[in-house]
């Protein structure tokens, strides 16, 4: 059961990054045909059903672990539950949570919980997972993410806590911590100040990154898509121009030079503007041979080249750097910022180029906190490439990078901020669906959820 849960949820995250997340945050751009999502015509995204399906299995893992007194499995189940629910609530807002998998209790139409309550529940579950996962809690059979190591899962639990707490940075709420009501800032600090009892990622060896094996079912999920469809996903002009400006070696990891430039030996990278119509995108810069696509070998041809990313060490360092600049914790922000960038380079097998940190826009502005935060968040955006929808979730909070709406969008020049609830909810769970709309607002991609209010 556990391998199927891990593989299924990670694959859903990867597939949604490919088809939607990479486009809306302008890592990639769509060309030639079916450019609707890049133009914000978001009729529906295949996110809800598969993730709730995985959650039903997660609940079984947790219940069996409790019955059999297997704390390591309960801890892993709580981590997976929190991560999957974080994807759902961050994408939709209020969603079924407390009654979401209670069919066995006779609840076939679960209520939609408020997003604030879901966040409190996720943070509580991750704290409980941290307590359950110990060196003595036992190995974890079927663990295709961390090969059965409970301490790796413990680090993931606490790293996810940092991610969720940072997402609450604009909310004036208090959280329960050991019976006391504390601020979001203090909750964050309680983790970073306790590496012995609440460890987080300390190297790329801790990355929550599913390694694919190169054969079904354990292969990169885009490997089985149609090759013609894959080639309609190009590097975005936004990402390409940013990486070229910084002479950033990750450009050749994320994408390929244009076919024409490979032929003539010049090896040029040309990104495509987001949201062009089918005809305009297909002919941009002279056509497909003069546009840079995704790295074909890494993200299509070799089924075990890329990894399914949940969270990385680089992200943890960026979270800490941002927290330092926000006066949440005391440490050196510049050191964390530079180490985060170096960790991202290392993650992709690249060395930090000489002089990289001396460039304007990369060199750390120690006397300008606002500019420092912008650079931290820009570099974090780069590092979150293909990490589910995390780049989009982070942009909604920070507005970084400062991107323009896609060119020929059909959403009145508004960048979407949520997914629509699936149409099936309107008929199968109508009363609870309507109650969520009454609280949150219309079922629109432009409706701001509680996190964004």
Give residue spans per PLM region.
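A broad detector of the eukaryotic-type serine/threonine protein kinase catalytic domain
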Residues: 10, 63-66, 381
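Acidic, glycine-rich segments characteristic of secretory precursors and extracytoplasmic regions
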Residues: 1-25, 34, 45-46, 60, ...
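Pocket-edge structural micro-motifs
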Residues: 9, 86, 253-255, 380, ...
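C-terminal functional modules
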Residues: 342-453
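Structured, solvent-exposed acidic/aromatic patches
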Residues: 26-80, 84-347, 369-373
């Amino acid at each position: 059961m556990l391998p199927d849960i891990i593989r299924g949820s990670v694959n859903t995250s990867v597939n949604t990054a490919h088809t939607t997340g990479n486009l809306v945050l302008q890592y990639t751009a769509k060309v030639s045909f079916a450019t609707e999502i890049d133009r914000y015509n978001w009729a529906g995204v295949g996110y809800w059903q598969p993730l709730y399906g995985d959650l039903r299995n997660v609940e079984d893992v947790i219940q069996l672990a409790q019955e059999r007194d297997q704390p390591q499995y309960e801890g892993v189940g709580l981590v997976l539950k929190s991560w999957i629910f974080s994807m759902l609530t961050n994408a939709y807002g209020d969603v079924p949570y407390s009654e979401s998998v209670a069919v066995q209790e006779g609840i076939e139409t679960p209520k939609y919980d408020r997003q604030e309550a879901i966040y409190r529940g996720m943070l509580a579950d991750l704290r409980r997972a941290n307590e359950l996962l110990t060196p003595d809690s036992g190995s974890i059979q079927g663990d295709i993410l961390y090969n059965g190591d409970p301490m790796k899962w413990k680090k993931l639990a606490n790293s996810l806590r940092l991610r969720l707490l940072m997402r609450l940075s604009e909310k004036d709420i208090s959280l329960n911590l050991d019976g006391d009501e504390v601020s979001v800032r203090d909750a964050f600090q309680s983790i970073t100040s306790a590496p012995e009892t609440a460890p987080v990622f300390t190297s790329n060896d801790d990355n929550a990154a599913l390694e694919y094996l190169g054969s079904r079912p354990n292969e990169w999920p885009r490997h089985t898509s149609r090759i013609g469809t894959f080639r309609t996903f190009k590097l975005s002009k936004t990402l390409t121009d940013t990486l070229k400006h910084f002479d950033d070696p990750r450009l050749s990891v994320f994408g390929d030079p244009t076919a024409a430039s490979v032929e003539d030996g010049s090896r040029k990278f040309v990104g495509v503007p987001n949201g062009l119509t089918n005809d305009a995108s297909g002919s941009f810069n002279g056509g497909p041979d003069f546009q840079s696509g995704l790295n074909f070998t890494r993200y299509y041809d070799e089924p075990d080249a890329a990894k399914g990313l949940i969270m990385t060490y680089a992200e943890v360092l960026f979270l800490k750097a941002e927290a330092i600049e926000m006066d949440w914790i005391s440490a050196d922000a510049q050191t964390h910022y530079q180490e985060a960038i170096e960790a991202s380079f290392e993650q992709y097998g690249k060395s930090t180029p000489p002089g990289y940190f001396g460039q304007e826009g990369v060199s750390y502005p120690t006397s300008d906190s606002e500019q420092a935060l912008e650079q931290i968040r820009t570099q974090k955006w780069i590092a979150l490439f293909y990490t589910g929808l995390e780049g989009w979730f982070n942009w909604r909070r920070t507005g970084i990078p400062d991107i323009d709406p896609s060119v020929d969008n059909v959403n009145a020049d508004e960048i979407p901020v949520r997914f629509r609830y699936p149409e099936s909810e309107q008929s199968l769970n109508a009363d609870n669906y309507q109650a969520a709309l009454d609280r949150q607002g219309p079922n629109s991609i432009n409706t701001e959820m509680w996190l964004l209010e």
